[in-house]
Curated annotation (Swiss-Prot):
<dbReference type="InterPro" id="IPR053925">
    <property type="entry name" value="RecX_HTH_3rd"/>
</dbReference>
<dbReference type="Pfam" id="PF02631">
    <property type="entry name" value="RecX_HTH2"/>
</dbReference>
<dbReference type="InterPro" id="IPR053926">
    <property type="entry name" value="RecX_HTH_1st"/>
</dbReference>
<dbReference type="Pfam" id="PF21981">
    <property type="entry name" value="RecX_HTH3"/>
</dbReference>
<dbReference type="InterPro" id="IPR053924">
    <property type="entry name" value="RecX_HTH_2nd"/>
</dbReference>
<comment type="function">
    <text>Negatively modulates RecA activity.</text>
</comment>
<dbReference type="InterPro" id="IPR036388">
    <property type="entry name" value="WH-like_DNA-bd_sf"/>
</dbReference>
<dbReference type="Pfam" id="PF21982">
    <property type="entry name" value="RecX_HTH1"/>
</dbReference>
<dbReference type="GO" id="GO:0006282">
    <property type="term" value="P:regulation of DNA repair"/>
</dbReference>
<dbReference type="GO" id="GO:0005737">
    <property type="term" value="C:cytoplasm"/>
</dbReference>
<protein>
    <recommendedName>
        <fullName>Regulatory protein RecX</fullName>
    </recommendedName>
</protein>
<dbReference type="InterPro" id="IPR003783">
    <property type="entry name" value="Regulatory_RecX"/>
</dbReference>
<keyword id="KW-0963">Cytoplasm</keyword>
<comment type="similarity">
    <text>Belongs to the RecX family.</text>
</comment>
Amino acid sequence: MPFITKISTQKKNTERFNIFLDDKYAFSVDADVLVKFELKKGKELDDLDIIEIQYGDEVKKGFNRALDFLSYRMRSTKEVEDHLKKKETSPPVIAEVIHRLNDYKYLNDQEFAAAYVSTHKKTNGKGPDVLFRELRAKGIDDDTIKEALSSFSFEDQTREAVKHVEKLLKKDKKLSTKELKQRAQLQLQRKGFSFDVISAAMDQIEYENDEDTEKEALRLHAEKAFRKYRYDGSYESAMKVKQFLFRKGFSLDLIEQLLQEEEY
């Protein structure tokens, strides 16, 4: 059986050590692995010893990678597993790393799910349906997700939905009242809010344009329609413009009024 004839510190990483067996480089280990297996000059190692030492070193590498990954933000168990897989860590090592992370309480899917809901419902205005799908994609089980979402009350959901629509109304001044309402409802659906929450939010919002704002929005769309259909005052071009503007949600009375104005 070979003997350890030399142990040297790596130049680029002083926490790792090169192990030489019978005067030939054999492998390297982390400082903690060196201490754990009591590696020192003159120690005899058989094949099983070497396999055990190298496995322990792979676990240490995986553990360090996981800690670095966790240092940026909280992660789910699946996120850590996926990260280690990308680093070509073997399944047995991943399982051991996850076990240790749980022992040290670096991983907790219940706490992760609760924090995820708390953060994303406020910063991104996401509704329960979207949060549910995202957490499931991160490997959180349905019961844990439901428990986390229980803190997102109907009142809180409605409040976040109202905030989202109010931002939309400030941004989209070029839309008709009808389009504003439709777009608001669609965006809330995409954000993951239920029909009941959307209805409650829409009831709280004043999305009706004042007359001047509605007319200004109509004029902007009319200019596009005039160019698109080459409006020349003829019946045919006027009908195409009217249909275009009506589909955009403007009233026929307002459209007729615009077309009758002298400049048109």
